[in-house]
Amino acid sequence: GAFKSGWNLGQEFVNMYLGHGGEFFKSGTAQPNVNNEKGVAALNVIKSLTELSNPDFLTQDTNAVKEEWESGNVALMHVWNSGASSLLDDEGDQAIRADTRLAPSPSVGGGSIPATTLWWDGIAIATNTSDENAEASFRALVGAASSAELANEYADATVWLIKDYKGGNTAGPVVDAATRGASPYPSFP
C-alpha cells in the first residue's frame, strides 16, 4: 500500500475510517471524533494490510507504488482515480497496461460503504490580482470546466460533473463509489 508517513498514511486512515462508517466530528461540533471503536478498527485494517505490503511501505507514496505496478512488482493496489489514468496510458510496459483493470473501491468491516472518499477539483485565483484579472480568470476556468467537448476530449483526466460527459476508462470506479455512498472528502464539521 501507499503508506508513506504523512499524507499517504493519513489518507488511508481516512479511507478506512469512513469505510467503517466513522464520522470525523462529533455531531454539531468541530470536536474530533476518531478515538473510538471505528478508529481502532480502521487502524487494525491498515496494520493487517502492512503484512501484505512492501517491507518499505512507510517510504512508499502513491507514485512509488504506481512505479512498482508498472514494473510488474505489485498485484493489487488502491489508488486515487486521478492517478489511475497514468496506468492506462501509452507509456511503460504495454503488456502490463493490457492486463491492468480498474475496479471499484472495496468496503471494509463487512459494510457496504466503499473505503474511499470523493474529492472534487476546484479552482483558485490569487488574491493579489486585479478584480478584472480575477473575473477574466474565473470566466475562463468556469467556461473550460463546463465544456462537454473539452470533458470528452480529456475523459480520462478526471471525472467531469457536467451534462453530456461520457465517462472514460477511469470513470467507472468513481461512479460506483458515489452510487454506493462514499463520503466526500472531509473538510469541515
Describe the function of each predicted region.
Residues 62, 79-84:
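Beta->alpha turn/N-cap motifs
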